[in-house]
């Protein structure tokens, strides 16, 4: 994979340099991106004189010929008008560099990095070394200094998705004092654009105010991905995390190594991920440190918990209106499982008036977790202790958890969640698979990292050491699940463990949840405790029923256990089709309305019928609540509250017994440009004179009436019948005329014979 790398960073004014109110167009022979071999770069400008240098800080020379690119180089282009230097832009080229990662190129004045006064990366002229804490005080990097830089980001396909000026800051807490540091880049109006407009993390979000270029924090000399791995697991429990994307970082054409692009947890994070306004948003961290909004609601929560005994159900129920207790439980399940001692200083929590006003917790900065240091510790007990027993569990950090555990329902919920998450997301098999996936993703890139970076590389590892750290992750994944299981027993004095074996037949036709956790597998196996009831909800899809286990609680304290194992079978069976003879006849996209037609000769009552509407990424049910009658051979229209039918893939109609009456599937989003149309059956019956119905797009909706096609068909039939009638009349008239003539001829012949 690894070839000779050449990086060219070109800086010039936004592809057009303004000169005396006229545009001066600059043309490059090569576009920014990745190339297999060295090349000559040609730069043309018909109306301006360009100068170039090999960095921001070098002396500029006139550009008279093409430039041969065969090494790592930055070329800065500029144009002067009346001694004014116009805004600079950057185009980066990578030669012989193959990667599965994104690539970031930062270009910044060396003074902004290393100058004693201006430099972000040096202690600075005011700093002094404090031997009591073993780091510099008043260092430049400890302040929120921000410097201008230019950033480019290339995606995994080699396409440039970001190219703009931005602000540059040092990012992190204690990691600021490390020789290698993380960066934050900020989009602001004063730099040009106030957002980084790209799908950085492959999600629907395409506009970011801040991006973190993180060296992996406390893990920066080990794996370079531990926090990204841990938060990828935590996100599967619905917890808020920073999305992550691995990258290679170049600064002024110098390779700095593997960094992770991360979201920043601030007000813009919630605007992006929850589409909520900033008004009414509160964000706090650590011990009541306010990041955004107000802390009044959180102080009220703490005050109530302090003054009330939460073992009293009424008091606990009130607390559930102030905080999302399931979210809080999942947060602590993950944090204690990872044995993360640094959770106290990195607690992040938030609420919004625009949602339900409840506080929720964020999994953040977990680099010290998932290690052998605290692998054998009972973190559940430590983080629910009423006294500070270690440096990482001051009483304020355990206050909420230890008080909530006084409530029996909360305690049982935490035990169940530990079992369910421990049997799924945090099972040994799941953890080993995730570690292997990250190893596969990173191993070739880390080889390049160790072999090609010169800055910071001394005493910072090798591929061999990196693989040893992978082995440590594997040991943790193999041992920690059984340790936390013992921790649960020890902390809550549990007994009577059993193994639940859950098998689901036809899982695509229903859902099963344990303690409100959807079980997506057809085969589930995991440990639980007989002293804690396990809620199970079995929900067949409309048109199906469950013919297996039918209880709402699993408690195998009786003779159901066989060798400490309880086997539960859930089987979803199709109920069959409805005898009702109604059909979906037309779907109007403008109104929107679904039209039904009664093919039967008797009345149909639609009360308690339902529509199932499947979208490209979701689904919903619409119920007919009131009594609605359809006369024989008549139509009924059902309004559907502005459903987006262009995103729909299927509509199904069920009767009051959940039996399927009719369905239609379609994909019309690519074939229409507006909503002034409908999708309809050509005829409302299963066949007419041998013609079968089909569905078509119609630009003349005919709700509660015959379709144009059906009307045309009936008119055609009428014409054909009229033609047949006329033909029959003509034949009949002809036969009568012929018969009359024959009678006349016969009469004349008879008369002549007599005379």
Enumerate the predicted regions with their spans.
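Conserved ATP-binding subdomain of kinase catalytic cores across diverse folds
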Residues: 106, 127-293
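Sec-dependent N-terminal signal peptides
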Residues: 4-13
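Short, compositionally stereotyped local motifs that mark structural "simplifiers"
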Residues: 19-140, 148, 155, 162-164, ...
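Positively charged n-region of N-terminal signal peptides that target proteins for export
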Residues: 1-4, 752-754
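Coil residues (strongly favoring Ser/Thr
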Residues: 66, 71, 131, 205, ...
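Middle-to-C-terminal accessory/interaction subdomains
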Residues: 102-104, 111-128, 133, 138-141, ...
